[in-house]
Amino acid sequence: MESRNSYENKIDEISSLSESKEHPIDIQEKKDAFVNEFKGVLFDKNTRSSELLFNFYECCYKFLPRAQPQDKIDSYNSALQAFSIFCSSTLTHNNIGFDFKLFPEVKLSGEHLETVFKYKNGDDVREIAKINITLQKEEGGLYNLRGLDFKGCFFSGQNFSNYDIQYVNWGTSLFDVDTPCIFNAPAYNKSNEKSLKPVSENGLSGVLTDRNNKIKLITGVAPFDDILFMDDDFDDSSSEDDPVENSPVVTSPVVSSSKSSFQ
């Protein structure tokens, strides 16, 4: 395999170019380079996975940079959805086992929202893609996260105090308990029931939300009293009384959290 530094340099180059509409990216070339890099690791006989990776790269480096400001959030959500579809195909159709993890990590800094899509296998952590969007500021001074679909994302040490999170979809997100996030407590939020049962599953350590407005898996303690979980379009038929240890494993990418950001 190519060295980690060399591979990440490629991703940085792609990401910087993607911020400009005037620097077209050879998406096919980038897709082929990634497939060759991970041939036999993420890709085996299933060509569908590589096609879905191409679709994901298109969302990141073609459609998102060209989207109008009012369409950025929808375009961002499309990139996350395309990544989730790629991950599902990779896990389902390639005979490569489940030792690796694929996940997007979200980082906030003022008006800047950066999402780094990562591959993790033990201590080997690599970037698959990186996207950035600029958030709009509301009259009340909060940055608008409304409508963002964060399900399947990982958060570590992010401060949401200056962000409007009322209509964020947190379904199947993972929050680091070693470096917890900080949330504001606006009047519209409500407390959520939670089951504080320690869980250790495939090295998972963190707070994993389910898609039915509840916290399903918890190790440690995290500040979730002031979060409103919303995913009204998902119908979870599982019993609310099922013990946590018997809860079904989510199909979205699951990640292992470590201190700070997996580094």
From Swiss-Prot:
Composition bias type Acidic residues, residue spans: 233-244
One matching Pfam family: DUF5508
Region feature Disordered, mapped onto this chain: 233-263
Disulphide bridges, residue numbers: none
Feature: compositional bias, Low complexity: 245-263
Top-level taxon of origin: Bacteria
Protein name per the record: Protein YpjB
Species this protein is from: Escherichia coli (strain K12)
Gene giving rise to this polypeptide: ypjB
